[in-house]
Amino acid sequence: MAKEYSFDISAKIDMQSFKNAINLVDKEVANRYDFKGTTYEVDYKEKDKLLVMVASSDNKLDALKDIVITKLLKQNLSSKVLEEQKTENSSGNNRKVTFKIVDYIESKEAKKIAAEIKNLKLKVTAQIEGDSIRVKGAKLDDLQKVIATIRSMEWEAPLVFENMR
């Protein structure tokens, strides 16, 4: 009986790393000269999976976004985990931007990924299971080709390859 190998493609986020990145943002902004004497806030709402940033101007808000993305990348998280929802005026001449935290693969994108895997013409199967995709195959080399191909393509969700068995 031949051994079958598999792995999962998902968009899970290491929430501890995410929280660490947000804490590092607070520390860096508190020490930056260009933010001295201005109002700013970076608030992570865990229940709603939202990140809310408030700054005194659009320039400060852009700088805050750049700092957040830099810290996420240093924690090995993709910048795609944040999806900008809306930018609006806040109290006291402040600007506010809300980001939704993306930790799932949408069904349309999951279908596209499964179709791409099928188009590779390898002896592997891709099965959509909720918010992840299980890829099975008899050869490890085929699975590694699938991973390399999917990684090389541009996707909306921050894809993670896990549970290689």
Swiss-Prot record:
InterPro entries in the record: DUF520, UPF0234-like_C, UPF0234_N, YajQ-like_sf
One Pfam family cited in the UniProt record for this chain: DUF520
GO molecular function term, any single one: nucleotide binding
Keywords: Nucleotide-binding
GO cellular component, one term: cytosol
Functional description taken from the UniProt entry: Nucleotide-binding protein.
Family: Belongs to the YajQ family.
Protein name: Nucleotide-binding protein Suden_0039
Native organism taxonomy: Bacteria, Pseudomonadati, Campylobacterota, Epsilonproteobacteria, Campylobacterales
